Design a protein with these regions (language model features):
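Short, flexible helix-loop junctions that flank or precede catalytic/ligand sites
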Residues: 1-196
């Protein structure tokens, strides 16, 4: 609360673990401050549900929130020993299914002989692991007027996710698969960090 008296433009709250912290963040946002915070959840949509479960008022909360960014770090394919390979049909089908068949069609290539994915062979640079460094995968949920209405109605996670995707949100898994197609990481890594 002392920060509010100092009239900052931006406030960073370390982590929201309880109702009191969440209420202060909402109050600060409603009085014109840009508030950033962290919370441990599996997805952007689950963040909304978690904060409502803490006891936040859904009307003030939905008015205060601009968006939610979920992020995970995947191991990056080692650039020194990265090699191209042609995926099997079952590997390809697994990517399509995880991405969402309806979302995949028209945006990504059909299975063909020229389709290429990448993996690390293993070298001295990466200690024979095939990975070196990290690559982030993201999920950004922007709060639209229709999303605010769902939050105020305390909608279920599935309803929030459906609306967020129709508003253009790309899920963690979808962003991870985009990084796989770009040759930055592997689907095994995306599965490990983004699929529960």
């Amino acid at each position: 609360r002392a920060f509010l008296r100092a009239d900052p433009d931006v406030i960073m709250i370390g982590e929201m673990r309880d109702k009191e912290t969440a209420d202060i963040a909402i109050e600060a946002s409603l009085t014109g401050h840009l508030v950033f915070s962290t919370i441990h959840t599996n997805s952007a949509v689950e963040t909304v549900v978690r904060l409502l479960d803490l006891g936040c008022d859904p009307f003030n909360f939905s008015d205060a929130m601009l968006g939610v960014l979920a992020m995970r770090l995947c191991k990056r394919i080692c650039p020194n020993c990265r090699e191209a390979y042609h995926p099997t049909r079952s590997e390809y089908d697994e990517l399509v299914q995880a991405f969402g068949e309806g979302d995949w069609e028209g945006v990504h290539p059909a299975y063909n002989p020229g389709l290429t994915l990448f993996r690390g062979r293993g070298c001295d640079t990466c200690n024979q692991t095939g990975y070196r460094g990290r690559v982030p995968i993201h999920e950004l949920m922007v709060v639209s007027d229709s999303m605010k209405a769902l939050i105020q109605a305390r909608a279920r996670t599935g309803e929030l996710l459906t609306l967020a995707k129709s508003d253009g949100m790309r899920t963690l898994v979808q962003d991870g698969i985009e990084k796989v197609l770009q040759g930055l990481t592997t689907y095994k890594q995306v599965r490990a960090v983004a699929i529960k």
